Amino acid sequence: QPNRLVAEMPELREMDFGKFENKTADELMNDPDYEQFIKGGLDNPPPNGESTREVINRCYEALNIIISDMMYEGLTNVAVCTHGGLIMNMLAGFGVPKRKPMDYACDFGEGFEVMVTASMWQRSNAFEVIGTYPPKYEEMPDYTVEDYYTD
């Protein structure tokens, strides 16, 4: 496929869940460390794992590399494929409109479309979230031209 470059970025790896890695919530339900972890917070990592703040910092590093490369190479469209937790944290941390991470949850094979300008990123470390991918259209009523011009 012409004009397609795939670059693996370690900054976009999934969150390190430490001692909770590869365990289900049911398996961890009576673990006091897990009970503490699910209370949330930016600086509340699982034992031997990574905090949300550390994940967001990694996301910033990745986005800075991606956006800088886009500007340098003159690219106007790129796709970033990564884990759902990173998608949610990237969009909540750097996306406009500002929303909670869970508001940016998506299923496998889904994601969001964002738009960024050099000045927006350089001045604000922000990008605009403009839609879902693939697009999800809400049911819209059918209108005729006459419907738009009647009182």
Task: Give the positions of each predicted feature.
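Short beta-strand scaffold positions
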Residues: N57, C81-T82
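Acidic, low-complexity terminal tails and accessory targeting/binding regions
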Residues: M15-D26, S68-T76, L91-D151
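Phosphate-coordination/substrate-recognition cap region in phosphate-metabolizing enzymes
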Residues: Q1-D33
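Short glycine/proline- and acidic residue-enriched helix-loop micro-motifs
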Residues: D33-E54
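Hydrophobic packing residues within well-ordered alpha-helices of enzyme cores
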Residues: Q1, M90-L91
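Generic structural signal for well-ordered alpha-helical scaffold segments
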Residues: I56, Y60-M71
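Short glycine-rich phosphate-binding loop at a beta-alpha junction
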Residues: L5-E8, G74-C81
